[in-house]
Each structure stands twice: as structure tokens, then as C-alpha cells.
């Protein structure tokens, strides 16, 4: 689809991998090659992966952006974001815009993110390990129609994810048997908190169709009504699985 969409007037290609909330995987190197051939620059939102698991600049991206609110901060106590590049010309242009527009984080917000970066590696390993355990549980549960996770060999982007990522992350989505069951499920958990954010040490659960992606309803970008999204934290995997088990009934 990307190749067909590129034209002479394409100036910028904005990508996300894994995508939110369906966890599709984009071949970053192939996408960057195609975009550059069309004369466009490539921006990758790397929030779901974090720099620990994926570094888009190494795969041809020109700019990488992150919500520092998520995995980089890691404790759900900061609001921020950043853009990074390894191109001196782009860096100069971004620096000018930042200075002229005042897009500068407060010193305490910056400190919180720097603090979070110190534990990023150990947290991401825990997120990934817990996610793998939760995926195994969901795969075997009859109340779950389908699990969406790039770490599964059955995932269509699994091989690409293996090439460009150092782990499959802490985000999981799955399809319940119906919208009614999905909505009921997210209200029944006790350890998983019903909330829209992600990437913190605590586990979160949400219904994208009624929460984060409600604005896409009745559009080509609408999420499946029976979709549930999980942000797997670093609590005991046994506790997380037991909570999902009772919520799924």
C-alpha cells in the first residue's frame, strides 16, 4: 500500500511499528528505501518498541519520535515526547523549530525521563517476559478468538519483527468472542487497571473501540468492536494471568 501511495508530491512518510492497537509490523528498511526513492523523508513513531527493542535510525529512518510518557519514563508520572535524528541538516531545522515554538520540557519532566532511562533495559526485559507468559495463557483460553502479538510465529509480521527488533514488547491485543464480552472483561479485572495509557510498570487494560480509538468509529480506521488492548507491566506474571483468568470467566 505504501509503494502505491507514494508520488512526486510526497514529502514525508510517517510510520509506526508495531502499530497501535493492532500490532501490525512495518518493514522499516523497505519502507525507508521506497520513501527515499520518492524523495520523501521518513519519520517513525517508535513508542511501542522503545529504543531498547528497536532503533529505526539504524533501519533507514530520518527521524524517530517517542512519547516519553510511555516506556522511557516508565512510571506513568510524566507527559512529554521527543524527536531524534542522525542527520545534521534535519537536526538544525528541528532545533530552530523547537527554539522558536518553545517546545521545551520542564526541568522536572526531563529529570523524570532521565531517571526512567536508567532502568529502561531491565524494565523492557520484564515487560517482554511477562507478555510472553500472558500470550501463552490467552492462546489457550476458549474465551479468546485471536491473539495479536508479533512474537507469535503465526503473526504475519513475525519474521520482520525478528529482524528489526530485539524483543517483541509488552503490548498485546486480542479479540474476545464479542463486543459485549470485551467490554465486560475490561471492567472485571482487579490487578489490570482500566486506563488508556501504556508503557508503565503497572499493567493496563482497555477497550480501544470505546476508549483510545473511539474517534475512529464508523471510519475505515475503526478498530474491531471485540478488540482488547493490554499494556503488560512488570508485576508477577502469575498474578496477571490469574486476574485475566477470573475476568474472562
Q: What are the roles of these predicted feature ranges?
A:
Residues 3-143, 148:
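Conserved PLP-enzyme active-site core in the AAT-like
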Residues 187, 203-249:
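PLP-dependent enzyme catalytic core of the Aspartate aminotransferase-like
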Residues 78-80, 167-171, 225-229:
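Short, solvent-exposed beta-strand edge segments and adjacent coil->beta transition regions
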Residues 48, 70, 119, 134, ...:
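Glycine-rich beta-alpha junction loops
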Residues 132-190, 196, 213-222:
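Conserved small-domain helix->loop->beta segment predominantly found in fold-type I
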Residues 101-102, 189-199, 247-249:
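A common structural junction motif
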Amino acid at each position: 500500500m505504501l509503494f502505491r501511495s507514494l508520488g512526486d508530491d510526497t514529502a514525508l512518510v510517517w510510520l509506526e511499528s508495531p502499530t497501535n492497537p493492532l500490532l501490525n509490523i512495518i518493514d522499516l528498511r523497505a519502507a525507508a528505501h521506497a520513501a527515499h526513492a520518492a524523495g520523501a523523508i521518513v519519520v517513525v513513531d517508535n513508542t511501542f518498541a522503545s529504543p531498547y527493542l528497536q532503533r529505526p535510525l539504524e533501519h533507514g529512518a530520518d527521524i524517530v519520535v517517542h512519547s516519553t510518557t510511555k516506556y522511557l519514563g516508565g512510571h506513568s508520572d510524566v507527559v512529554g515526547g521527543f524527536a531524534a535524528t542522525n542527520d545534521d541538516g534535519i537536526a538544525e531545522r528541528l532545533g530552530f523549530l523547537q527554539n522558536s515554538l518553545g517546545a521545551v520540557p520542564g526541568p522536572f519532566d526531563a529529570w523524570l525521563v532521565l531517571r526512567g532511562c536508567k532502568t529502561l533495559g531491565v524494565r523492557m526485559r520484564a515487560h517482554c517476559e511477562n507478555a510472553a507468559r500472558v500470550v501463552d495463557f490467552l492462546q489457550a483460553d476458549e474465551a479468546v478468538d485471536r491473539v495479536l502479538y508479533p512474537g507469535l510465529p503465526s503473526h504475519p509480521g513475525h519474521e520482520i519483527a525478528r529482524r528489526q527488533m530485539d524483543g517483541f514488547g509488552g503490548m498485546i491485543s486480542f479479540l474476545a468472542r464479542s463486543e459485549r464480552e470485551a467490554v465486560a472483561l475490561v471492567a472485571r479485572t482487579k490487578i489490570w487497571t482500566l486506563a488508556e495509557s501504556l508503557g508503565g510498570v503497572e499493567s493496563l487494560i482497555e477497550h480501544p473501540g470505546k476508549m483510545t480509538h473511539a474517534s475512529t468509529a464508523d471510519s475505515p480506521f475503526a478498530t474491531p468492536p471485540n478488540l482488547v488492548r493490554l499494556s503488560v507491566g512488570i508485576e508477577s506474571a502469575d498474578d496477571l494471568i490469574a486476574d485475566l483468568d477470573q475476568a474472562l470467566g
